């Protein structure tokens, strides 16, 4: 049986990203292969045996397991699997491994994947395969059975305050838009002025889900966000995601797009949602539920992972230009 060395954060007690990816993919890998599991911060070096596969998420530390192992001779396949957005602060260090890897399974939304040719890392494109995220309904049950009255509908932001989340814009929306009332479930190093702070919430608990059901829309306004799992998780609950396209999803069923860094244009979107009839909101919700059942499924995600493992694709990429090398090296040094 083929041995797969899987490098990804995993924790069966945690259903949030990135653990949900490691859990869902890892459990399925274990059914089909002999699997060895590693955390992405582990500092071991793997010495492959003939036929072994390396699959997973690199870490920017040069003493981490993927970094130390990918250069070892003898791998049958080397497959990088990690989030992607056109933000060198997040992805520049992947370039250390790209030429050695057979494929890059890019976990991202359609917005970013459709624009790779315009990105600084466009030379990676031959190796990139689009991995649209998924959600497990067992952990994120449907709870939103009715919407609040017009003009009284509420928005929920779930997450932290890292730069890619663009929480300064979230604050401006709360302070300047008449049609939006935002609460924040989560923690972060920064404050988000104006929003109602709920703090950390354990969404595995009935009390937390009851609070979720009081909201109508999930909101996230990232500027450089691959495709946060909270979008699909909230949609599974029955909330309607209202998101910037730069949060990964562009013109997707069940998801409402909000303009990036344009308060006046965003207010137009929010005012329409506040004025919408129940029938209109229920139809958006229905389309989202249908998309989850049809497309945003872990079995579909894993099928693409397995195809990469069992396949033979290993397209070459061109060398970086001097300008590309300079930019990538500069941002790689940030870590």
Label each residue range with its predicted role.
Residues 102-142:
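Donor nucleotide-sugar binding/catalytic pocket of nucleotide-sugar-dependent glycosyltransferases
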Residues 137-138, 148-197, 203:
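Conserved catalytic-core segment of nucleotide-activated headgroup transferases in glycan assembly
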Residues 1-65, 257:
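N-terminal pre-catalytic "stem/leader" segment of glycosyltransferase-like enzymes
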Residues 278-331:
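A charged, aromatic-enriched C-terminal amphipathic alpha-helix characteristic of glycosyltransferases
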Residues 239-244:
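Short hydrophobic beta-strand element within catalytic cores of glycosyltransferases
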Residues 223:
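Aromatic "clamp/platform" in nucleotide-sugar-dependent glycosyltransferases that forms part
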Residues 36-118:
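Extended catalytic core of nucleotide-activated donor transferases of GT-like folds
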């Amino acid at each position: 049986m083929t041995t797969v060395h899987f490098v990804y954060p995993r924790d069966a007690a945690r259903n949030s990203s990135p653990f949900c990816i490691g859990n869902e993919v890892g459990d399925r890998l274990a059914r089909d292969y002999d699997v060895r599991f590693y955390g992405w911060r582990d500092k071991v070096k793997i010495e492959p045996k003939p036929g072994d596969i390396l699959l997973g998420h690199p870490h920017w530390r040069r003493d981490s397991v993927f970094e130390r192992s990918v250069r070892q001779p003898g791998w049958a396949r080397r497959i990088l699997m990690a989030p992607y957005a056109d933000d060198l602060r997040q992805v520049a260090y992947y370039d250390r491994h790209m030429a050695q890897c057979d494929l890059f399974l890019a976990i991202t939304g359609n917005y970013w994947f459709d624009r790779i040719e315009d990105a600084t890392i466009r030379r990676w494109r031959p190796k990139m395969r689009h991995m649209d995220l998924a959600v497990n309904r067992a952990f994120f049950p449907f709870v939103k059975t009715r919407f609040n009255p017009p003009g009284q509908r509420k928005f929920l932001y779930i997450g932290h305050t890292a730069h890619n989340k663009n929480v300064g814009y979230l604050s401006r929306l709360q302070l300047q838009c008449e049609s939006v009332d935002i609460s924040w479930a989560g923690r972060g190093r920064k404050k988000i002025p104006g929003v109602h702070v709920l703090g950390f919430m354990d969404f595995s608990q009935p009390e937390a889900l009851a609070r979720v059901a009081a909201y109508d829309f999930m909101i996230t306004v990232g500027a450089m966000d691959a495709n946060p799992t909270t979008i699909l998780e909230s949609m599974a609950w029955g909330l309607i995601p209202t998101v910037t396209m730069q949060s990964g999803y562009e013109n997707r069923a069940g998801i409402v797009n909000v303009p990036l860094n344009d308060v006046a244009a965003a207010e137009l979107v929010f005012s329409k949602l506040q004025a919408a009839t129940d029938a209109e909101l229920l139809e958006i919700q229905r389309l989202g539920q249908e998309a989850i059942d049809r497309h945003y499924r872990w079995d579909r995600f894993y099928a693409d992972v397995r195809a990469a493992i069992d396949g033979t694709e290993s397209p070459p990429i061109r060398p970086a230009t001097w300008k590309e090398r300079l930019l990538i090296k500069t941002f790689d040094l940030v870590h």
